[in-house]
Design a protein with these regions (language model features):
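Absolute protein N-terminus
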Residues: 1, 23-24
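Short, glycine-/small- and polar/acidic-enriched structural segments
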Residues: 24-115
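Absolute N-terminal positional cue centered near the fourth residue
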Residues: 3-4, 19, 98
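Cleavable N-terminal signal peptides
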Residues: 9-11, 21
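Sec/Tat signal peptide C-region and signal peptidase I cleavage site
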Residues: 16-23
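Bacterial N-terminal signal peptides that target proteins for export
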Residues: 1-9
């Protein structure tokens, strides 16, 4: 449930951040988890909702199956994903540079759209 709400807020934020007149379509990708998991299903639902009205807001959303939370954080940090679903404990570790993120240090630019 928390993940679904997080993805819904993500989609809302992406739509509201877009300008009203679009010169060209913008593409965003949501990193999720395995194709049989809840993260993937929720990400797919968010993208379907966004793509339904893409002519209005100019954003085309795609969902990507990934290795999950840590992969999504690292891939966002590398600039290869726009958004990603992650568990709050891994987000905490990423922003504080602890656990598996200790080597690379704090990820100070990581933001939560909702939790």
């Amino acid at each position: 449930m928390r993940t679904t709400l997080t993805l819904a807020a993500l989609a809302t934020a992406a739509v509201m951040a877009a300008p009203s007149a679009f010169a060209q379509q913008r593409f965003i990708t949501i990193g999720t988890g395995g194709v049989t998991g809840v993260y993937y299903a929720a990400g797919g639902a968010i993208c379907r909702l966004m793509n339904k009205d893409r002519a209005k807001h100019g954003i085309r959303c795609s969902v990507e199956s990934t290795g999950g939370s840590v992969f999504n954080i690292n891939t966002i940090k590398a600039g290869e994903l726009d958004f990603g679903v992650t568990q709050s404990d891994w987000q905490y570790h990423a922003t504080n540079g602890s656990k598996v993120f200790e080597k690379d240090g704090k990820h100070t630019d990581l933001r939560a759209v909702f939790s």
